[in-house]
């Protein structure tokens, strides 16, 4: 693999097309693919209202302390520092997306949201589309897994937006095991959209959410996280779908209070990074192995290169089998 940071970025902007020929026909369910957790949170807006999914205690906290409260919230809610374009160029191919409307918005605009509102959905999708236009053999997974204040008319608007932005690059639903890089390249598909809402049953290019399970450890303890990840990967072989391993720690209220001014990255992510990276490097992709791996602050600890490198173990296996 490329040794310098600059070479790494160049390599990983087209890492899928750079994989060995022996991996082009392997189902994408069997490859190791780096993804980002709360992918849009690089652009959480402190000037925005609090998201509708937040509990009353948070709403009251913000109403009393205003901008100061939102600045502190951002330190814990923003899990990424790179925008979509930078993530794509660095090698990220899976995006964890949460959609919300703003209260009393006459335009019915759709936003990415996690506690506070982020960029508009259209802005984000257009960034992704621009990247794909100049990287024709790269493929992305868009996982729309939370919807806040989203009614049927908003779902219809989002579906139309996806059609407009991506057009013929949207891959219709087929058996997950059929989807390889070779299959997608031949048909010129670049986008798989997973949609955790019954609307997925009505639209040919919306893959049902159950085809992208992403079990969540919900712990601040790195050891418990690793045990959970290991158990969920073992359980994965019974599903026959894509699969997300969320290598992320979730702060409790007490954790936030202890490190309220330092934030998620400094208080939790950086401290746990060595053990999380050790687990990733010990994994192998394949039918019973890891598939999509997501993290907070994906630029840390050579996370992206570590995940992509796992695919080269598959190549060694393929060569040894021939």
UniProtKB/Swiss-Prot annotation:
Q: What highest taxon heads this organism's lineage?
A: Eukaryota
Q: Which InterPro entries match?
A: PI-PLC_domain, PLC-like_Pdiesterase_TIM-brl, PLCXD1/2/3, PLipase_C_PInositol-sp_X_dom
Q: SMART domains of this UniProt entry?
A: PLCXc
Q: What Gene3D superfamilies does its record include?
A: Phosphatidylinositol (PI) phosphodiesterase
Keyword annotations for this protein, in alphabetical order, are: Hydrolase, Lipid degradation, Lipid metabolism, Transducer
Active site residues of this protein = 37, 114
Q: Which GO terms describe its cellular component?
A: synapse
CDD domains in alphabetical order: PI-PLCXD1c
Q: Which SUPFAM superfamilies match?
A: PLC-like phosphodiesterases
User: Which residues are in the PI-PLC X-box domain?
Assistant: 22-197
Task: Spell out the Pfam families in the cross-references.
Answer: PI-PLC-X
Could you tell me which PROSITE patterns the record lists for this protein? PIPLC_X_DOMAIN
Q: Which GO terms describe its molecular function?
A: phosphoric diester hydrolase activity
**Could you provide one GO biological process annotation from this protein's UniProt record?**
lipid catabolic process
* Name under which the protein is recorded: PI-PLC X domain-containing protein 3
Species for this entry: Danio rerio (Zebrafish)
Q: Which gene encodes it?
A: plcxd3
